C-alpha cells in the first residue's frame, strides 16, 4: 500500500466480527470542488449551454434592434429589453442543468455516494452562476452596441455589474431547484419556464427597476440602494429554502 493510500483511506477499518466497513463521509467542501470541477470541465471540453445561451441573447438583441426601429433606447425600455433577454437565455441553461447527469446515470451515482446532498446544490448553483456570468460578458456589450447610444461611464457599468451578480445568484438558486424537479419529468422543456418564470418575477422587477436610472439619458442619480437590497434579501431567502428542500427534491 502506498503512503498516500495509508494517509487518506477511503473506508473505515473493518468492524469487529467481520462486518463490512462503513464508507467514510466525503467532506462537503471536497465534494463541492469535485462536482464543480466536473461541471465546468464538461462545459469547457464540449461547450453546449454557454454558446447556446450567448447565441440566443445576441439573436434576441438583434431582433429588438430592428423591431424597435430606433437608433437607441433608454430608461425603462432599455432595462426591460436587457433583462427579458437575459431571463429567457437563462431558461436554456436551467433546462439542461441536470440532463447529462440524469441520462448518463451520474445523478443516481451521486445519490449512492457517502456525502451531503447539499454538495450537488452548491456545485450546480455555482456552475449555473458561472454560465450566466459568461453569457453576460457577451450579451451586455452586444446590448450596448446595438441598442444604447453613447457608451455609459465606468461607474454605470460597475453598478450594472453589481445588479447582474445579485440577479445571477437568485436565478442560479431557483434554476437549480427547478432543474432538479424538471429533469425527472418528460416535459422538462415545458416545466422549466412554467415553474421558474413566476418565481423569478421579483428578480426581473428589482433588476429592471434598478437598471432604469442607470440607462436613463438625463439621470445622474445612480443606482437606488433599495433594489440591490431587495435582490440580496431574495437571494438569502431562496438560498435557505433551497438548502432545506433540495434533499427531498433530488431523492424523489
Labelled PLM ranges:
Residues 69-78, 141-165, 211-228:
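Membrane-interfacial helix-loop-helix connectors in multipass membrane proteins
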Residues 91-113, 125:
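Transmembrane helix boundary and interhelical loop/hinge segments in multi-pass membrane proteins
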Residues 117-144:
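Selective transmembrane-helix segments that form parts of the transport pathway or gating/packing helices
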Residues 4-50:
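Aromatic- and glycine-rich beta-strand/loop motifs that create alpha-glucan
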Residues 78-94, 98:
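Long, hydrophobic alpha-helical segments
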Residues 162-197, 248-252:
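A structural motif at transmembrane helix-loop-helix junctions in multipass membrane proteins
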Residues 2-9, 13-16, 235-252:
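Junction motif at the cytosolic side of a transmembrane helix
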Residues 47-68, 83-86, 195-206, 234-241:
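Hydrophobic alpha-helical transmembrane segments of multi-pass membrane transport/permease proteins
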Amino acid at each position: 500500500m502506498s503512503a498516500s493510500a495509508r494517509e487518506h483511506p477511503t473506508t473505515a477499518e473493518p468492524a469487529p466480527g467481520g462486518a463490512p466497513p462503513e464508507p467514510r463521509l466525503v467532506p462537503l467542501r471536497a465534494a463541492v470542488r469535485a462536482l464543480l470541477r466536473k461541471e465546468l470541465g464538461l462545459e469547457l471540453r464540449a461547450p453546449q449551454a454557454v454558446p447556446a445561451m450567448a447565441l440566443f441573447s445576441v439573436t434576441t438583441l438583434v431582433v429588438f434592434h430592428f423591431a424597435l426601429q430606433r437608433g437607441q433606447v433608454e430608461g425603462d425600455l432599455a432595462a426591460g429589453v436587457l433583462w427579458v433577454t437575459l431571463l429567457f437565455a437563462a431558461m436554456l441553461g436551467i433546462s439542461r442543468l441536470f440532463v447529462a447527469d440524469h441520462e448518463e446515470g451520474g445523478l443516481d451515482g451521486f445519490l449512492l455516494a457517502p456525502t451531503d446532498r447539499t454538495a450537488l446544490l452548491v456545485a450546480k448553483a455555482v456552475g449555473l452562476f458561472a454560465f450566466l456570468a459568461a453569457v453576460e460578458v457577451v450579451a451586455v456589450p452586444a446590448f450596448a452596441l446595438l441598442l444604447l447610444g453613447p457608451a455609459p461611464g465606468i461607474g454605470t457599468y460597475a453598478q450594472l455589474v453589481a445588479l447582474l451578480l445579485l440577479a445571477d445568484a437568485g436565478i442560479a438558486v431557483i434554476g437549480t431547484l427547478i432543474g432538479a424537479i424538471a429533469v425527472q419529468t418528460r416535459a422538462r422543456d415545458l416545466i422549466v419556464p412554467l415553474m421558474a418564470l413566476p418565481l423569478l418575477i421579483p428578480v426581473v422587477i428589482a433588476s429592471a427597476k434598478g437598471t432604469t436610472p442607470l440607462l436613463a439619458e438625463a439621470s445622474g442619480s445612480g443606482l437606488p440602494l433599495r433594489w440591490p437590497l431587495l435582490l440580496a434579501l431574495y437571494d438569502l431567502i431562496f438560498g435557505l429554502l433551497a438548502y432545506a428542500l433540495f434533499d427531498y427534491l433530488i431523492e424523489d
